[in-house]
């Protein structure tokens, strides 16, 4: 595990302990009962693929450790609506506060503002967090293989499945991919960012994609800024993308989302 992830795990463990003391598991389950049913995150992405379209998981992210504040006028419901209007298939909403200035209420508010399924984007270590995710309205959780053992990942996956949620399993290299393929989740994200250097390169996705059987749905993550980037990854067998920063920085988020998915030329020809 990288030094960055070790530091994150330390504060997350403290956060989880404090959360458990404030809100019991029984309370979370009561909150889940008041939520609408999971919307089918994986299903929404496969529907795009089967229709011959790119599938976009559009991210709602206020800040990041490497870039600082990304969008000063941060309005999760408005962003969710803009992404939906632009053709996104799903949302990803940051709920981690120390590193990303995220919050649970951002997830709840964004999902309530649209019809898209939403991912709780956070660092997951305990099944309690899975129950939090569903209580807040999440339809999917993220598992970062670099920060989990195989047993931990499987336990979190199975807990998520038991609540009707999907699981996006994130990898950064070949050894993590081999571990991810042992899990039953069909959703595998390839993060193009090096966790040790923060450098980004699409060659990571292009290299690792060849390891994956056709029954899995691959998601390209990080370093995707243009329609040309999407086309490049499509050539490697990746038709689904998680994109945040490049869209969050645009004034017209809906137009930027459409341009990413279909290209400026297609829009100009309409």
Curated annotation (Swiss-Prot):
Pathway(s): Amino-acid biosynthesis; L-tryptophan biosynthesis; L-tryptophan from chorismate: step 4/5
UniProt keyword annotations, A-Z: Amino-acid biosynthesis, Aromatic amino acid biosynthesis, Decarboxylase, Lyase, Tryptophan biosynthesis
SUPFAM superfamilies: Ribulose-phoshate binding barrel
A Gene Ontology BP annotation from the UniProt entry: L-tryptophan biosynthetic process
Annotated catalysed reactions: 1-(2-carboxyphenylamino)-1-deoxy-D-ribulose 5-phosphate + H(+) = (1S,2R)-1-C-(indol-3-yl)glycerol 3-phosphate + CO2 + H2O
EC number assigned by the record: 4.1.1.48
Any one GO molecular function term: indole-3-glycerol-phosphate synthase activity
Pfam families: IGPS (PF00218)
Entry superkingdom: Bacteria
Claim: Cell inner membrane is one of the keywords in the record: no
Record PANTHER family: INDOLE-3-GLYCEROL-PHOSPHATE SYNTHASE, TRYPTOPHAN BIOSYNTHESIS PROTEIN
Family assignment from sequence similarity: Belongs to the TrpC family.
Protein name (record): Indole-3-glycerol phosphate synthase
Gene that produces this protein: trpC
């Amino acid at each position: 595990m990288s030094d960055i992830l070790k530091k994150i795990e330390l504060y997350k463990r403290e956060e989880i302990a404090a959360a458990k003391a404030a809100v019991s598991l029984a309370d979370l389950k009561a909150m889940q009962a008041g939520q609408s049913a999971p919307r089918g995150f994986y299903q929404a992405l496969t529907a795009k693929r089967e229709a011959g379209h790119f599938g976009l998981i559009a991210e709602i992210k206020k800040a990041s450790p490497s870039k600082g504040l990304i969008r000063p006028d941060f309005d999760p419901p408005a962003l969710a609506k803009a992404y939906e209007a632009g053709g996104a298939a799903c949302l990803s909403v940051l709920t981690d506060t120390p590193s990303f200035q995220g919050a649970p209420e951002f997830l709840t508010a964004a999902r309530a503002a649209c019809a898209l399924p939403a991912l709780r984007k956070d660092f997951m270590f305990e099944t309690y967090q899975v129950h939090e995710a569903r209580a807040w309205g999440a339809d999917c959780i993220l598992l970062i293989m670099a920060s989990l053992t195989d047993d931990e990942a499987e336990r979190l996956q199975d807990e998520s499945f038991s609540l009707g949620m999907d699981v996006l399993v994130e990898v950064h290299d070949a050894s993590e991919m081999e571990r991810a393929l042992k899990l039953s989740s069909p959703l595998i994200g390839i993060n193009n960012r090096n966790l040790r250097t923060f450098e980004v390169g699409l060659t990571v996705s292009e290299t690792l994609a060849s390891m994956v059987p056709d029954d899995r749905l691959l998601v390209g993550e990080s370093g995707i800024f243009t329609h040309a980037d999407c086309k490049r990854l499509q050539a490697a067998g990746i038709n689904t993308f998680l994109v945040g920063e490049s869209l969050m920085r645009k004034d017209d988020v809906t137009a930027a989302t459409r341009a990413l998915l279909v290209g400026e030329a297609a829009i100009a020809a309409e």
